[in-house]
Amino acid sequence: MNEESPRALSRELVLLLCVLALMVMLALTALFSRLYHKKVHTLADAMFAQGEADERAAQQLAGQAQAAHFKLALTDYRNALAYNPTNPLFQFHLARALAAAGRDDEARSYLLNLLSESPGSGEINLELARIAARNNTMADAMRYYQGAIYSEWASDPIAMRWQVRRELCETLLNRGQVKQAAPEVIALAQNTPADDAVRLTIVAQLLLRTQQWNRALEAYRTLLAGDPNAEDCLAGAGQAAFELGQYVTAMQFFDRLPRERREQPDLLNLFDMTRRILVADPFLSGLSAEVRAQRAANALALVQTRVENCARQTGQSLEQTPPRTDLQRVYQQSRELQQDWTPRYLERFPDRLDAAMAYVFSVENAAAAACGEPQSDDRALWLLGRSRSVVNR
């Protein structure tokens, strides 16, 4: 009994030592594993940070220098993913860099995988929208843009959704898709505070580009209430009023601009045409009967020349009996009524001025249909007629 007891104790001791040794080895393994993974993640984060720096540098450059930095960013992001292959942030930045480098197919593949895992990501939807727009697949672009607008954003979601919708508007307008852009611009305007002058200015410009003249004029009036001398707002308001046929209002805005601004290419023709229209318009308030009659007589003389020139241009005989074309019909009408539309007659019978000017407008319309839109003073009369038809409708 006494001889076997030490042997039993030594077996227990050996077992205990083995267990302790195993625990120490497991602890060391866990420690080294943590140190390894920490080192790997540190390397991955360093590679990712370098990729971000290269990407930011590329965005500030152009040409070959930009391409070189995007190439460096791609290498950095790929290296980061080699150390941390499941990191979605690394994958997203790699996809964005691929897209910036023109490698849309590769970028789309990464982004679609990410979208399947995070369908509510605004950033992923936006990048997919941009790729689709670049490749002229506008149905997909619209879908992804809408997804980005109504998706989640990590910070300041209201501002990001506004920016995305603005980008959608610009994308459509740059492709000439004015009708498709119009409702998006309206939605953008509805989400723009009236006291945010910077954003409201952008909206007003987009309203002009989508030919929503009333909304544009309203937006510019709001802006001018805060800054009455803002030149771009005065110019935009003048253009909107001009397109609405509100020529007196347009001139009021143009007159508030410095002469140098009115003479710039974007306004010179508008200002000149507004002036011509107001000089020719016999319906302006405050004019004497004599001036109204003289303006109407001048318009009648002008359209007489217009109809004759247009007939020569199109090879029509104005003596055709019976008249067959609109141009021939308005010419025959002038021969019948010309003697009743002298300045003295129109001054004596001012109620006949409406009929005389209606004839002027019918001549300009007939000539425009036969020979194209008029220029100079004829264009002034043509536009005046169009604006009055809208008012009287």
Model regions and ranges:
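N-terminal leader/linker segments that initiate helical-solenoid repeat arrays
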Residues: N2-Y83, P88-L89, R386-N392
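Short coil turns that delineate tetratricopeptide repeat
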Residues: H41, P85, P119, W153, ...
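Alpha-helical linker/edge segments of TPR/alpha-solenoid repeat scaffolds
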Residues: R103-E106, N136-R143, E170-Q180, Q211-R215, ...
